């Protein structure tokens, strides 16, 4: 399932979802009503977005992957709240920020576990990929844990594209821009892992993403 700038409440029960956010400012609410593991992924472009995820029953499992390209003239803001209100739930969130130019990036995420819940777990991983000489990065992870017998963890990575991989690809005949594009294309491809989507539509989104990257890398 795919939607664009859909601010209405999303109820996840039996279908994984990809959403495209572009030139949007507002809030998205997601309610977990699933018993089988699901995935929510989103490409977040030029957007000031707040996402609230709430469990609606015990036993819900969700994998979230958010890809956020950031450019100089459009500072990005992303604020995610993971509210685990029931026992035996699991939410794993990964935020990848691709900083394409001398840009400002602000991403914050909160894991909140209510009193009394048991055997729930949540992890937050924030990755910042620096594709420019100077960047302004502000990540604000918050763990609000009010219960025992649960698991919560946070991790962060800041890195540049792998120079050894770039050199290897160039040794195989690619020029520097082609090698860079090949490495970067792996990030939007991860959006569609576990998502039912037509190959043509997936390739179009990846192509548009790479065009966006080229325009802001020039």
Task: Give a label for each model feature.
Residues 183-189:
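Small/polar glycine-rich anion-binding or flexible loop at a beta-alpha turn
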Residues 1-167, 171-172, 190, 196-218:
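Conserved beta-strand/loop scaffold segments within soluble protein domains that form the structured core
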